[in-house]
């Protein structure tokens, strides 16, 4: 029995040595260790041995089984390594071939429009200044000549944090903060882009939106300078458009005006977008109120200035024909991939 066990294991080891694939190794395992395998049959025949030999032969049989199992595992591991090495060699990367570029995103339409606005005014000699979004009530209202009973100070229109702190409702506070640093020096030409917050939410309004404030101060600035600046801006942003200035009111400018351009959809002929008026409002503007200059440190008798403000979403909606402001914030790739 001992000789037979040794012979079976030697035959199995020879078969393994010649195995070149994992499939052949599995065939050897089944042939010798399977339910009907050679070694299995030998072990089952131990019952015919004399009782005195069974413990010795049983121990030897288990040792032979373990030896064969180890040989099978060793050969399988070796073949897997060789197979992996061959696969890697066949899949060698040719670094001279062009790679596959990852999908590149694009700029958000609001970022594109903001950058375009900034570049237009940078070309006119303006500088970019930013201010805090969490603002003091003084800079947001009082320093900008808002009376105590102005509707904008109502809790229904403004997000107040406490009696003196709020989320700014416009970027105009940057104007006063800048003047406090520059007064009495002139000239000053600044644009102030940033986020603002108002209690408003519908198809054309959002509780958070982006605005650009622009202002200039010098010794002899007139309404004509304001008009010339805005005419240039409209031409650069929208192309050749008719413009009109409508009298309006803002606490921090006097005189004040709303600025309209001929409809970007119908060209001024009248359509649903412009409510059949032929005009679309794009911004508010005016000459800086003397009181705003004085509280900021300027002598209103010696200097003057103009200011204007526009919503970036509003400009983008007009420029691209978008009719719902919520599209800018929905993160819908079907919309964003168009830009």
From Swiss-Prot:
Single GO biological process annotation from the record: phenylalanyl-tRNA aminoacylation
Chief localisation class: cytoplasm
EC category: ligase
A Pfam family this chain is assigned to: Phe_tRNA-synt_N
Cofactor comment text: Binds 2 magnesium ions per tetramer.
Residues involved in Mg(2+) binding: 254
Catalytic reactions on record: tRNA(Phe) + L-phenylalanine + ATP = L-phenylalanyl-tRNA(Phe) + AMP + diphosphate + H(+)
Localization terms from the record: Cytoplasm
Cofactor entry: Mg(2+)
E.C. code: 6.1.1.20
Gene Ontology molecular function, alphabetical: ATP binding; catalytic activity, acting on a protein; magnesium ion binding; phenylalanine-tRNA ligase activity; transferase activity; tRNA binding
Family: Belongs to the class-II aminoacyl-tRNA synthetase family. Phe-tRNA synthetase alpha subunit type 1 subfamily.
Subunit description: Tetramer of two alpha and two beta subunits.
HAMAP family for this protein: Phe_tRNA_synth_alpha1 (MF_00281)
The protein's name: Phenylalanine--tRNA ligase alpha subunit
The organism's taxonomic lineage, starting at the top: Bacteria, Bacillati, Bacillota, Clostridia, Thermoanaerobacterales
